[in-house]
Amino acid sequence: QFKNIDNKQALAAIGQPKLMRIYDEVFESFGLQVAQCLLTYHDFEKEATIENTKNPIHTLLKHEIIPIINENDTVSAEEIIFGDNDKLSAMVAKIIGADILFLASDIDGVFDKNPHLHSDAQLITKITNLEEIEKFIEEKPSKLGTGGMTSKLKAAQICFENNVEMYIVNGNQNNFVENALTGNIPCTHFQKK
């Protein structure tokens, strides 16, 4: 029933405020305030739109307000078909000058084989050259989104081109940011040589 683009856009419009309510409640329990930033890939095409995207994010961060950034699926038919938040997050990391990007997924990182299909898959903990790992990628979309491992590698490419470190971590792990940085959880760290 909801397979065509118009219906998916309508569902996005219904779901977005519900999602933001959840974020608001969770962050508020830690004494933090959030703001919603809905973006499209067109926001990254011209210098003027890049500035219009970057400036509010910087202002929110300056005031210690956490921007919740998501694709604006209600108006972006292309992104419903092709989009993912992995690439979008890398593009945002680029324009705001981030040092590190964390991609929270349903797996611990990049494996030499798809861990959903192969029980003997081995985690690759450090990646300094994207070409070396492309042969390992077997696509399986994330359970929670449209972005599978290929989209994460596209995000890594953007990060490599802009000297942004990137981690793929299991978002179900407690304190995954701190624990990834200190090496206390399995994850994949991308850092260009």
Name the predicted role of every residue range.
Residues Q1-K193:
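C-terminal catalytic "cap/lid" subdomain
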